[in-house]
């Protein structure tokens, strides 16, 4: 597999002449678009090998490499007249490489299995077009060094197990009173597991629930130097197919009745954490020295602590809990 994709940037390419007319009155941290951006380029390679183990079983190994160049990112224009300013340019690059091992068992004795494991390394100078924006606004040099990207999920495991009885002459289930009691039902179980996404650890404690963040966050270690915990999720589906026909001349209508459970084990997987503590429900501010002083200054410290803690419980920091669906699909 070989693929080359070239596309126009979707960020920062609009020209607004008024921004330049009043450049001197704008703050030096203001961002100006760049109408002279070049197309972003992605080159994707993949090579694989597939081997049949039996008539119904196969193993596939694939290695992939993706390179992105001329990616748009924020940069600071130094020594410009009349003031220095922040703009965007085609400076970022990234590489994503890894391998995938897949196992496929076609339906054998009512059982079908598909599973895959992916090992991936994603590095580059920026995860998106604004990842360098704060650095450019701070007046620091335009540093470029490969780091872990924010979507660098090192390990990913997927598995799909399906067990179902077929209909007609292929039925091999129990029969009671000439009745095929388990004709066309099925049970499907899906597993999704993977290592956590990287994030930037923080060395000091500040408030993430107040309207103003004080003091400023201080980076701890390297960019994206910490990772979220592993995620595990099971989804289960129980369904059965039916065929309905009004009369011999009418068209058959397929009906599928299903009972579906997402996040079967009600796992509390983390989507995001507070950088200072690495926890999804505590930013560490209330227990810090500066936080305790701030709490003591409130009219009702106990009420403040209670409401502050409630605000820290951001539901977006967790994946959705267990959900149950009962439905009908009609195919005609």
Protein language model annotation of sequence segments:
Residues 1-4, 13, 59-65, 115-119, ...:
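Transmembrane beta-barrel strands of outer-membrane/channel proteins
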Residues 3-12, 20-24, 29, 35-86, ...:
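Membrane-embedded beta-barrel scaffold of Gram-negative outer-membrane proteins
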Residues 6, 168-215, 229-233, 239-332:
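C-terminal beta-signal and adjacent terminal beta-strands/loops
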Residues 10-17, 24-25, 72-78, 120, ...:
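Outer-membrane beta-barrel translocator domains and adjoining extracellular loop/strand segments
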Residues 26-33, 81-88, 96-97, 139-145, ...:
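Extracytoplasmic loops and strand-loop junctions of Gram-negative outer membrane beta-barrel proteins
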Residues 35, 47, 89, 99-101, ...:
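Membrane-embedded beta-strands of outer-membrane beta-barrel proteins
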Residues 41-43, 93-97, 153-157, 230-234, ...:
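Residues that define the transmembrane beta-barrel architecture of outer-membrane proteins
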Residues 63-68, 79, 84-196:
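Gram-negative outer-membrane beta-barrel transporters
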């Amino acid at each position: 597999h070989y693929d080359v994709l070239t596309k126009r940037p979707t960020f920062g390419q609009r020209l607004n002449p008024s921004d330049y007319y009043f450049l001197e009155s704008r703050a030096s941290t203001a961002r100006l678009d760049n109408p002279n951006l070049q197309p972003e380029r992605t080159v994707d390679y993949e090579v694989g090998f597939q081997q049949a183990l039996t008539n119904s079983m196969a193993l596939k190994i694939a290695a992939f490499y993706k390179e992105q160049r001329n990616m748009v990112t924020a940069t600071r224009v130094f020594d410009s007249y009349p003031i220095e300013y922040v703009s965007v340019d085609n400076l970022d690059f990234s590489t994503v490489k890894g391998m995938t091992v897949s196992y496929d068992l076609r339906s054998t004795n009512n059982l079908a299995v598909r599973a895959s494991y992916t090992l991936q390394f994603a590095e580059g100078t920026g995860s998106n077009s604004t990842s360098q924006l704060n650095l450019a606004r701070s007046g620091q040099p335009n540093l470029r060094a490969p780091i872990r990207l924010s979507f660098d999920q090192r390990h990913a495991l997927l598995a799909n197990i399906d067990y179902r009885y077929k209909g007609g002459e292929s039925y091999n289930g129990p029969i009671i009173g000439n009745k095929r009691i388990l004709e066309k039902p099925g049970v499907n179980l899906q597993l999704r597991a993977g290592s956590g996404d990287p994030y930037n650890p923080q060395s000091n404690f500040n408030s993430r629930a107040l309207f103003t963040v004080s003091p400023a966050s201080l980076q701890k270690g390297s960019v994206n130097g910490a990772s979220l915990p592993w995620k595990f999720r099971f989804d289960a589906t129980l369904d059965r197919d039916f065929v309905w026909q009004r009369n011999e001349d009418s068209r058959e209508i397929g009906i599928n009745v299903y009972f579906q459970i997402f996040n079967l084990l009600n796992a509390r997987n983390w989507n995001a954490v507070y950088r200072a503590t690495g926890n999804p429900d505590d930013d560490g501010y209330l227990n810090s020295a500066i936080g305790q002083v701030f709490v003591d200054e409130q009219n009702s410290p106990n009420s403040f602590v209670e409401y502050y803690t409630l605000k820290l419980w951001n539901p977006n920091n967790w994946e959705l809990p267990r959900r149950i669906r009962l439905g009908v699909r009609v195919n005609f």
